[in-house]
Amino acid sequence: RDRSVSRGLGDVYKRQILDLGLTLEYLETHGVTVIGYGTSELPAFYTRKSGFGVDYELDTPEQLAKAFHVKRELGLRGGLLVTNPIPEEYSMDKEVIDKAIAEAVEDAKKDGIHGKATTPYLLAKIKDLTGGDSLDSNIQLVFNNARLGAAAAVELSKLEK
């Protein structure tokens, strides 16, 4: 496993809320293929759309498992990142969340927040600014990702028997 990629992804995650284009550039540079689950557009954190494309769109857990399996069997380097849109009913209004993010980022700068304190600070500030709606969205995103990850893992286990 390429440790420089796994170490760097934490930094990318912190900046993800700020610059998805930069995140995609970083991932491409480090050989990480970005897959959209049921979408050709990279989902943003709180919304289903970002305006950025993904490398491939796959529509079933079976397809995801096959992609991981084939990559492993061929010994290809780099990673695969599956991006899974937030369920529609929990997607936030883009203007509302963009405004909250911008305000939270500005407050973080004013308060001298940096390093590993950045993500918790931003998430808490955005939660406050959205009256808790961002937390509800975040929780549903986690549940949705867990369901997809579990389904893909079941399918991958069938391929690797």
Which stretches of residues belong to each language-model region?
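Single conserved hydrophobic/aromatic residue that forms the stacking wall/gate
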Residues: 1-13
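N-terminal loops that bind phosphate or other acidic moieties
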Residues: 7, 24, 57, 88, ...
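Short coil/turn connectors at secondary-structure junctions
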Residues: 7, 29-32, 41-42, 76-79
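Short, ordered loop/turn segments at secondary-structure junctions
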Residues: 14-15, 32, 37-42, 85-87, ...
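Short glycine/serine/threonine-rich phosphate/pyrophosphate-binding segments
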Residues: 17-21
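Short, solvent-exposed amphipathic alpha-helical segments in soluble enzyme
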Residues: 22-29, 45-46, 50-53, 96-102, ...
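Anionic-ligand binding region
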Residues: 48-73
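A C-terminal functional module that forms or caps the active site or interfaces directly
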Residues: 79-144
